[in-house]
Structure formats: structure tokens, C-alpha cells
């Protein structure tokens, strides 16, 4: 993708062209309102430092949405999606705004963050199709209401790829996709991930990369798909996936 410097205020047409998706006026208003809400909540809860200018529009909005260019071609299609480790609400809130057909679950283990995100969901008028849950993913992955129920499961800046795979794969429908948002990515990362996918009964379906606008760095997206049902023992008990990563 070509690089497009950001203006001081709202993004221009070149920004959205680079993203491959242009918001409706109401969606742009929601994205701006989300920025204002983040500013307000950051004074009470440390959600994110990426709130102003390029930090928000590129490192939050653009970085949340570019991996979903395929899905953004049919934004009103009914989908069930989950954002694991949502933190301050990304990528989940940006995805919910951009894809009106999606029903989103935003999951995080830190109660003060989920309380802030729930308040933002309410203020943005998204509570009819966005739910916020406070839980550890190792526990949530065994919940009958979540396990095997999602078309899309995504995680950004959560843990190493083999760990994230163990978190996300059990949540997928048989034809679902896990989206691993990655920064640096190389051959060693790929080998470790492929080894981790074997016991999960999953496979790597695609990988792609993107140069963020304004020379904000390169990002990678790794998509995973189930091959057969994920064994019931995954995800393992709280803390085990990160201490003893699959494929290590």
C-alpha cells in the first residue's frame, strides 16, 4: 500500500483509499466520537496512549481495519466476531463500527478496562450488537456460549503467535477464521506457529502485510482456519499457554 501522510484533523480521501474502505458519514462520526470517549476515559483509566492525531487514526483505526479488507466488501453480512484481549476496545470497536452486520464480543480480563469499554459501547449506540465480557480467555474458551461459535476471532498485541492461536482456534466455527494481528514476522515465527497448529487441528490459510501510512511501520496479518474440531483440552488452564507455548 502507498503511504499517505495524515492531516491534523479527520483523514482525507487518500487515507481511506489506502485502507480500501470508506466510512459512511455516520460511521465517521462514530469513529470521531470514539476518539473523544478514549480521551475522556484515559483521564480515569489507562486504556491506551494512542489517542491523538496519527496515533489514533493510523495506529488504532487503520491498523484495526486493514486486515478485514475482504470482510469490509460485505459489511452488512451477518457475522459473529470476538476480539480477545480488547484492552481499550481495539480492534473490536473499530470493526463493530465498520461492519454493521457483525455482532461483536469484546473480551478482556481487566475489569476496569471492560467497564470503560462497556460505557463507550453504550455511548456509541452499539449495545444492541456489541457485548463486553470480563474473563480470562483460557476460561472463556471452554464456555459453551463462546466455544465454536464465531465466524471471526481476532487478537492484536496480546501474546506470541502460538499462544494466540491456542486462544482463538477453540472459538471458531468449522468455517471460521482466526485473525492474528502481528508486528514483526519472520521465518522462525512461522515455523513455531505451524508446529503449534498441529495439536489444535488448525492450519494457516493466508498471510499478508501492510505498510501503515506515514511510515508508521509494517504490520502482518496471519489467518488460521480449523481443519477439524479443536481438542477439548485447549485452551489449557489459565497461564499455561503463555508459560508452555505449543510448538516450543
Curated annotation (Swiss-Prot):
The UniProt entry, under Gene3D superfamilies, shows:
Vaccinia Virus protein VP39 (3.40.50.150)
InterPro entries per UniProt: rRNA_ssu_MeTfrase_G, SAM-dependent_MTases_sf
Q: What is its EC number?
A: 2.1.1.-
The UniProt GO MF terms for this protein read: rRNA (guanine-N7-)-methyltransferase activity
- Main localization (coarse): cytoplasm
- Can you list the GO cellular component terms from the UniProt entry? cytosol
In which compartments does the protein localize?
Answer: Cytoplasm
- Report keywords, A-Z: Cytoplasm, Methyltransferase, rRNA processing, S-adenosyl-L-methionine, Transferase
Q: Where does S-adenosyl-L-methionine bind?
A: 85, 90, 137-138, 156
Q: What does this protein do?
A: Specifically methylates the N7 position of a guanine in 16S rRNA.
Q: Which NCBIfam families match?
A: rsmG_gidB
Please give the family membership noted in the entry.
Answer: Belongs to the methyltransferase superfamily. RNA methyltransferase RsmG family.
- Supply the HAMAP family for this chain: 16SrRNA_methyltr_G
Q: What is this protein called?
A: Ribosomal RNA small subunit methyltransferase G
Q: What gene is this protein a product of?
A: rsmG
Amino acid at each position: 500500500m502507498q503511504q499517505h501522510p495524515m492531516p491534523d484533523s479527520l483523514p482525507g480521501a487518500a487515507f481511506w483509499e489506502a485502507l480500501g474502505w470508506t466510512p459512511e458519514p455516520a460511521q465517521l462520526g462514530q469513529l470521531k466520537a470514539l476518539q473523544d470517549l478514549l480521551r475522556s476515559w484515559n483521564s480515569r483509566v489507562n486504556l491506551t496512549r494512542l489517542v491523538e492525531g496519527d496515533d489514533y487514526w493510523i495506529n488504532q483505526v487503520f491498523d484495526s481495519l486493514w486486515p478485514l479488507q475482504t470482510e469490509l466488501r460485505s459489511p452488512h453480512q451477518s457475522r459473529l466476531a470476538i476480539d480477545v484481549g480488547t484492552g481499550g476496545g481495539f480492534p473490536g470497536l473499530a470493526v463493530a463500527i465498520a461492519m454493521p452486520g457483525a455482532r461483536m464480543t469484546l473480551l478482556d480480563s481487566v475489569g476496569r478496562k471492560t467497564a470503560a469499554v462497556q460505557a463507550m459501547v453504550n455511548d456509541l449506540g452499539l449495545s444492541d450488537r456489541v457485548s463486553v465480557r470480563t474473563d480470562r480467555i483460557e476460561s472463556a474458551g471452554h464456555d459453551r456460549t463462546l466455544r465454536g461459535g464465531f465466524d471471526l476471532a481476532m487478537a492484536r498485541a496480546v501474546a506470541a503467535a502460538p499462544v494466540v492461536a491456542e486462544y482463538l482456534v477453540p472459538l471458531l466455527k468449522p468455517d471460521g477464521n482466526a485473525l492474528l494481528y502481528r508486528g514483526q514476522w519472520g521465518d522462525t515465527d512461522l515455523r513455531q506457529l505451524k508446529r503449534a497448529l498441529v495439536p489444535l487441528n488448525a492450519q494457516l490459510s493466508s498471510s499478508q502485510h501492510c505498510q501503515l501510512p506515514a511510515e508508521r511501520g509494517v504490520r502482518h496479518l496471519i489467518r488460521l482456519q480449523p481443519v477439524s474440531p479443536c481438542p477439548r483440552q485447549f485452551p489449557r488452564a489459565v497461564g499455561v499457554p503463555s508459560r508452555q507455548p505449543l510448538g516450543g
